[in-house]
Amino acid sequence: MKEGNVVQHHGLYRSEFEHDNCGIGAIVNIKGQKSHDTVANALKIVENLEHRAGKDAEGKTGDGVGILLQVSHRFFSKVCKPLGIFLGSERDYGVGMFFFPQDELKRNQAKKIFEVIVKNEGMNFLGWREVPVKADVLGSRAVECMPCIMQGFIERPKKVKQGLDFDRRLYVVRRVFEQSSDDTYVASLSSRTIVYKGMFLVKQLRMFFEDLQNPDYESAIAVVHSRFS
């Protein structure tokens, strides 16, 4: 959307370069201290970027909204334990965010392909977690194409260093998988960061992903993006 009152010329500003664009924002704790406040405040930022977010004619489905956070060991260790997934220490595992097809057969095939690739790359696959979501907050178009959203966990090999070295190995896994499965989208795969995203209005991101509302989810950094296509 465009505002009616635009300054024509002031200093180096030139109105002819004014145009609609995506919205971005970021929060960083300079001491590296993780907290849920960082997550909550980043969500407030993106919720105030409605003027930088596209939507359909009905006004119920957005062009896309997302948030990048650090992998919260406190959160994932708690939610994975009841599933029989034991993660070990912080940064000793990678987390992937997968958008699988709703068709069960295709989904199971894609999951199996990923597990085989992880094994072939010399790593141990720990298990799957279905991400809890609230589909009733979405618009009809988003519901029609909504994937099955799952997280996959990979153990860090002892011979691979934490951080960048491990993430490089995970990147290879991701690229091989993306060439092997046309029906699945990998939003992120890392031991350090994770991405939550979808075809949301800006206020739907927080409501859709229950993980983002959990006070145990902590991060020292957060980057948000609202898409204006």
Residue spans of the language-model regions?
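N-terminal segments that mediate ammonia production and transfer
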Residues: 1-229
